[in-house]
């Protein structure tokens, strides 16, 4: 991860073609970055555009935007794209620099007996299926630093102009998910739609948000026809989260604005949730049409819950 960030910074140039940062300066940043991860305090929070040492107040000489983009160059461990008939099984993934396994723009995918150990690693997602169809995912174990089992479907208006398939026809069952930000996690890339998902017979423990559905005001698309049933959740911060107010601080890309995404046709049956610190259910539509035209009036609809049991709900639940 450090090598890719250094290479990115070394290739940046000024308007006259000269190098923006010297090797000496780039090499000196290692300590800053390590301390930032250790105590969450090295990037200045007061509106300045430079990367600074908050202890001494000295300017480290690097733009914040360049640090953000360099950090985003960390490589994922395994990426497959535009493939048909994929089987991933009987492997262990340990401490990836970024995402663990991503299968994109593909069809007919099976993932079985994959063990992912990326807990406390930033963006250490477990198994991800982006713009892929006909996915079966079962008997896996994920102990992750970010989302455990995730989906995505492109972003922005440009996604509609491309021949990109929806993320659909997904069956996930008999998985054990531990730690992580989201157990079942769909979005925030929703531009071409995520739909027709059956998620069942799964145990989730110490997940921040067990069922996590997210989009941002400009990503567009939808999440629809999601069924969650026969699952057990313990020690979570929030059980169900549906929001169009999500933003990714590590994103290094920009896209043409799309109409705001919507969530509809969600069904949850026979789910037990024990130990909820905050919300049992949060549904948020980010609406601000007067101040921000990219946040028009929209609603999420047709959300059905049956035989849901909550226990030991916290004071904020």
Model-derived segments and their meaning:
Residues 1-317:
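Extracellular/periplasmic carbohydrate-active domains that bind, remodel
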């Amino acid at each position: 991860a450090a090598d890719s960030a250094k290479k990115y910074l070394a290739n940046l140039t000024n308007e006259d073609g000269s190098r923006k940062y010297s090797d000496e300066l780039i090499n000196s940043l290692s300590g800053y970055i390590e301390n930032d991860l250790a105590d969450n305090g090295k990037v200045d929070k007061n509106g300045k555009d430079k990367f600074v040492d908050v202890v001494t107040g000295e300017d480290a000489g690097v733009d914040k935007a360049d640090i953000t983009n360099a950090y985003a160059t960390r490589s994922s461990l395994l990426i497959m794209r535009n493939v048909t008939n994929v089987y991933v099984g009987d492997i262990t993934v340990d401490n990836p620099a970024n995402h663990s396994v991503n299968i994109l723009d593909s069809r007919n995918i099976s993932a079985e007996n994959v063990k992912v150990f990326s807990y406390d690693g930033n963006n250490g997602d477990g198994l991800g299926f982006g713009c892929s169809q006909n996915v079966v995912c079962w008997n896996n174990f994920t102990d992750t630093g970010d989302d455990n089992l995730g989906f995505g479907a492109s972003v922005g208006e440009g996604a509609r102009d491309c021949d990109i398939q929806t993320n659909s026809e997904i069956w996930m069952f008999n998985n054990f998910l531990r730690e992580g930000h989201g157990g079942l996690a769909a979005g925030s890339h929703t531009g071409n739609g995520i739909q027709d998902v059956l998620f069942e017979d799964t145990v989730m423990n110490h997940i921040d948000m067990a069922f996590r559905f997210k989009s941002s005001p400009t990503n567009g698309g939808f999440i629809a026809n999601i069924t969650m049933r026969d699952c057990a959740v313990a020690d979570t911060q929030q059980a169900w989260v549906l929001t169009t107010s999500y933003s990714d601080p590590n994103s290094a890309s920009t896209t043409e604005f799309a109409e705001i995404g919507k969530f509809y046709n969600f069904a949850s049956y026979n789910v037990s949730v024990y130990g909820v610190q905050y919300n049992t259910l949060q549904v948020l539509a980010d609406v601000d049409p007067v101040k921000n035209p990219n946040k028009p009036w929209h609603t999420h609809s047709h959300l059905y819950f049956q035989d849901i049991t909550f226990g030991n709900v916290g004071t904020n639940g």
